Every structure is written in structure tokens, then in C-alpha cells.
């Protein structure tokens, strides 16, 4: 099995940027979460849920970490990561909650860049497992 080289990031187009989300990015993150809900044909979060999401992203310490993906300076994708714990292993685990790219920005390596940023977050930490659920895309 090939282990990703986290010290030499793969090449991404210059138009692609992934960075930790800031409080100023909250409206863009919420718009992307609503975009994911629309894509999944689910109701979007209500105002109370959006308020809790912002609180949890930017509390100290944050309950979830958000990474914002941009293409040509436009907010086009995001991922959420949070730490959990395995009672059986007695070690921390990381959970990848969402990894979403707006349809208009797919095929530009932004999803790959978001995933790589998640792997860089893990790099060097003693994390026994990484959990995520992969669902079959609704448009297949």
C-alpha cells in the first residue's frame, strides 16, 4: 500500500486553494452546506442549526474544523473534520464529516485538494483510525 507523502504535496492548479475556514468565511460555508443539502435532496439546515454550526466551528476550542476550498478565489467546496475516540482502541480517531464540491467546480482537483488537506491535518498525530461514510452519489 502506498503511503501519501504529506511533506511534498501533490501539484494542484494554481487556481485551487484549500485553507482553514475563518469566521469571515461563515456565510460561504453555510451556502456550501445548503448546496450539499440540495445535492443530496435533503432539507437545508434551519437558522438554529446554522447558528450552532457557526458557534461550533469557531468556539475555543472548536468542536469541528472546517476547511474551505476555493477555485479562482470563489468558495467552491469544503470539508469538516472532528476528533472522536475509540473505546476499544483507547485512542483518538478523526471523523471526516463532509467533503463537498459544487458541481460547477468539479473535475478541477478541488476535492482531491480538500482530501489531501485532511490527510495533512492527520500527519504526525497518533490517530489510530479515520472514519467517514461514503454514500453513493444521488446523481448516479
Kindly label every feature range from the protein language model.
Residues 71, 81-88:
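A conserved beta-strand-loop-helix scaffold within acyl/acetyltransferase catalytic domains
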Amino acid at each position: 500500500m502506498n503511503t501519501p507523502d504529506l511533506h511534498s504535496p501533490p501539484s494542484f492548479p494554481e487556481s485551487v486553494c484549500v485553507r482553514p475556514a475563518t469566521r469571515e468565511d461563515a456565510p460561504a460555508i453555510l451556502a456550501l452546506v445548503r448546496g450539499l443539502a440540495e445535492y443530496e435532496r435533503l432539507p437545508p439546515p434551519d437558522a438554529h442549526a446554522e447558528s450552532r454550526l457557526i458557534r461550533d466551528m469557531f468556539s475555543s476550542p472548536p468542536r469541528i474544523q472546517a476547511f474551505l476550498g476555493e477555485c479562482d478565489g470563489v468558495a467552491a467546496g469544503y470539508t469538516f473534520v472532528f476528533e472522536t475516540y475509540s473505546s476499544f482502541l483507547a485512542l483518538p480517531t478523526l471523523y471526516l464529516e463532509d467533503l463537498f464540491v459544487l458541481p460547477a467546480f468539479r473535475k478541477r482537483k478541488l476535492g482531491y485538494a480538500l482530501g489531501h488537506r485532511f490527510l495533512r491535518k492527520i500527519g504526525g498525530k497518533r490517530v489510530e483510525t479515520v472514519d467517514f461514510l461514503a454514500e453513493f452519489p444521488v446523481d448516479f
